[in-house]
UniProtKB/Swiss-Prot annotation:
Membrane-crossing residue ranges in chain numbering: 460-480
Lineage summary: Viruses, Riboviria, Orthornavirae, Negarnaviricota, Haploviricotina
Intravirion side: 481-524
Protein name per the record: Glycoprotein
Domain of life: Viruses
Subunit structure: Homotrimer. Interacts with matrix protein. Interacts with host TRFC. Interacts with host BST2; this interaction inhibits viral budding by tethering new virions to the cell surface. Interacts with ITGB1. Interacts with host GRM2.
Miscellaneous comment in the UniProt entry for this protein: Arg-352 is highly involved in rabies virus pathogenicity. Its mutation dramatically attenuates the virus.
Length: 524
């Protein structure tokens, strides 16, 4: 029995608030007490507010938020960062060209960013070519600077749309907020001076497809509408509702934090700026179905307790606790004073923490002050314990409240480099590290030879150099051939000291050169 009570309180709490769960209901307005007979006891109907007299139920259609609308209001965009790559060249006397690359930032224009984004999305090679380093120019004995502008597109960069004022929220914005995209303002500034944010969709249209039409039953009394039974079967009271626009659509914010758009006859005040609406997701719908089932089950338990009272003709504090109104709204409160059964009209409110109703020992806070007890008895089964502590049977559900809060899920969006809180920007207009991964490496290089001549002069010089080289090679080969010829003759006629015979002009064999000379002189 106790686990079912805890589950009910927990499920009921989830559907009635956003953030911390309400764990109890207690009157914030309590009328005068009057004695009654046990036959006047009744179980509250938590699905329809009978006390307002709106018992006429008629089908109608209304508009509410789509399931998961908070996660659906995402505006996809991109960031555009301007980068200037500078190539500085110096050509020395012998013609060596030294090139040094540097990068700086510049603030881009929205039109140029839109064009670069379209290039990137379409796979246009012009985008990749725009990221290349500039082709350096150089002149002999001069320093020449060549610059090239590039636009770094980083996508996606997802922002959250505030449906109340249509502003955009992201860590990439200064103060994490941008006033929004309009016809006159097509971009948002970022926390980097040389980067702007733009939406993927160039049309300045707010993506507010967050509403859906639902069917329910209107609870009315003549022309007065007190509330309605929603599509899940849970009654929603219009008491305390205020007017609130979401994405330009006028609707009502109910006391439980839900938002609906429906026709009402009465005048309703506007909501203050701090009044927000609750999340609407599949989990809340599922829990609301479970809440309806639990409300029906709790009504059956209340009827069982009431039957026991009628049968035994006796009333206990624990049995009276079953007659408490379980949802905010009008109801009855019961107690026993001096063995007399008492009843009072009450308007119940939700309690999110026990400190709201038990601020100090022995104090049960009702209507802004400590409610007096009669011999340790309050109402609805609430009593004062022997140690002067207020005893509430459902207080043990607070242990499960902490457990349920741990089960709340959160969505971690893509971390844009500008949204990283650890990012530290450099001083001046020096290029940041987050753009380097999108650009070619810059390095210092020595390449090329330049003698200060025009292009045709370079070709003439190269041709002349080639011809001179050929002449030098030919001359060298000729010199080497001439140098080798005398050496070979000396080896042929010098001999090694032995006799060498030659033939004279007369055909006579002469044993040596000297004999040949002698013979010649004799003949003469």
């Amino acid at each position: 029995m106790v686990p079912q009570v805890l589950l009910f309180v927990l499920l009921l709490g989830f559907s009635l608030c956003f953030g911390k769960f309400p764990i109890y209901t207690i009157p914030d307005e309590l009328g005068p007490w009057s004695p009654i007979d046990i036959h006047h006891l009744s179980c509250p109907n938590n699905l329809v507010v009978e006390d307002e007299g709106c018992t006429n139920l008629s089908e109608f259609s209304y508009m509410e938020l789509k399931v998961g609308y908070i996660s659906a209001i995402k505006v996809n965009g991109f960031t555009c960062t301007g980068v200037v790559t500078e190539a500085e060249t110096y050509t020395n006397f012998v013609g060596y060209v030294t090139t040094t690359f540097k990068r700086k930032h510049f603030r881009p224009t929205p039109d140029a960013c839109r064009a670069a984004y379209n290039w990137k999305m379409a796979g246009d090679p012009r985008y990749e070519e725009s990221l290349h380093n500039p082709y350096p120019d150089y002149h002999w004995l001069r320093t020449v600077r060549t610059t090239k502008e590039s636009l770094i597109i980083i996508s996606p960069s997802v922002t959250d749309l505030d449906p109340y004022d249509k502003s955009l929220h992201s860590r990439v914005f200064p103060g994490r907020k941008c006033s929004g995209i309009t016809v006159s303002s097509t971009y948002c500034s970022t926390n980097h001076d040389y980067t702007i944010w733009m939406p993927e969709n160039p049309r300045p249209r707010t993506p507010c497809d967050i509403f859906t039409n639902s069917r329910g039953k209107r609870a009315s009394n003549g022309n007065k509408t007190c509330g309605f039974v929603d599509e899940r079967g849970l009654y929603k009271s219009l008491k305390g509702a205020c007017r609130l626009k979401l994405c330009g659509v006028l609707g009502l914010r109910l006391m439980d934090g839900t938002w609906v758009a429906m026709q009402t006859s009465g005048e309703t005040k506007w909501c203050p700026p701090d009044q927000l609406v609750n999340l609407h997701d599949f989990r809340s719908d599922e829990i609301e179905h479970l809440v309806v089932e639990e409300l029906v089950k709790k009504r059956e338990e209340c009827l069982d307790a009431l039957e026991s009272i009628m049968t035994t003709k006796s009333v206990s504090f624990r049995r009276l606790s079953h007659l408490r109104k379980l949802v905010p709204g009008f109801g009855k409160a019961y107690t026993i004073f001096n063995k007399t059964l008492m009843e009072a009209d009450a308007h119940y409110k939700s309690v999110r923490t026990w400190n709201e109703i038990i601020p100090s020992k022995g104090c049960l806070k009702v209507g802004g002050r400590c409610h007096p007890h009669v011999n340790g008895v309050f109402f609805n089964g609430l009593i004062l314990g022997p140690d002067d502590h207020v005893l509430i049977p459902e207080m043990q559900s607070s242990l499960l409240q902490q457990h349920m809060e741990l089960l709340e899920s959160s969505v971690i969006p893509l971390m844009h480099p500008l949204a990283d809180p650890s990012t530290v920007f450099k001083e001046g207009d020096e290029a940041e590290d987050f753009v380097e991964v999108h650009l070619p490496d810059v390095y210092k290089q020595i390449s090329g030879v330049d003698l200060g001549l025009p292009n045709w002069g370079k070709y003439v010089l190269m041709t002349a150099g080639a011809m001179i080289g050929l002449v030098l090679i030919f001359s060298l080969m000729t010199w080497c051939r001439r140098a080798n010829r005398p050496e070979s003759k000396q080896r042929s006629f010098g001999g090694t000291g032995g006799n060498v015979s030659v033939t004279s002009q007369s055909g006579k064999v002469i044993p040596s050169w000297e004999s040949y000379k002698s013979g010649g002189e004799i003949r003469l």
